Amino acid sequence: MKFDKSQLLIYAVTDRAWTGKMSLYEQTEAALKGGATMVQLREKGLRDDNVEEYLEEAKKMRALTEKYNVPLLIDDNIKLAKACGADGVHVGQNDMDAGLARQLLGPDKILGVTAKTVEQALKAQSQGADYLGSGAVFGTSTKKDARPMTMEQLQAICASVRSR
């Protein structure tokens, strides 16, 4: 799938802890119907516990996102991304070096990288990141280790990579 950055408007990140009575599939489809333009499968509980279940979930999500012509990214797992036919991966600063991720993915897959500083953003961009994930700007209960950044920090990150 060709990645058009201008089409990235709403980025849905999965977390089965928040699905309530809906299945992960149902919740993801609701997000797609609501206008999500990219989906990241980020299921921390399935990663190491049950690789086969995670692969099956990833294949279901791949079929669903294809139905809506929306890219699917896998959080931190290039092997799983390749196995399910995902459009790319998102890696955090403590997961895998962005340059290595780009090398393993190849030039035609989407690479997202978490960047919480200008230095991290510039490094990720130079190593082939297609987009950056920055934040949280506000406190959140969805990511326990997230420390809010100021709007000034976010603006500095955006300004540092915007013209490159």
Can you describe what each PLM-predicted range is?
Residues 1-88, 95-96, 103-130, 146-149, ...:
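Conserved N-terminal beta1-alpha1 strand-loop-helix module at the mouth
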